[in-house]
């Protein structure tokens, strides 16, 4: 994987979280784009066609679960890797994420270095 061509879409309604997670990924050379909710994420994903979407579950306007389901049905972006990053760590939340089509589910808080390591793997 070439970090310079690898596009990541980070989606969270908390600007501080987007900034904390974006910084180390950008320092590693990844192309990082951000969105604040599921609706923005879908629109941006169609435009930039990211390799990975890191998606919060609980957001206004459209939550991550619904956004994931819509992404999986869109042939243009359906093969995009999707990782949920959520404060909801209950089994039923993780199961809902995987049932929606997620490839991975990580619970917050996550150290930015750990996220970078997961992206690289």
Predicted regions and their residues:
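Receiver (REC) domain active-site loop signature in two-component systems and cognate sites
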Residues: 59, 97
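Short hydrophobic/Thr-rich beta-strand motif most characteristic of the beta2 strand and flanking loop
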Residues: 29-36, 44
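Charged docking surfaces used in two-component/phosphorelay signaling
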Residues: 19-27
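Active-site beta3 strand of CheY-like receiver
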Residues: 48-54
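C-terminal output helix
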Residues: 109-120
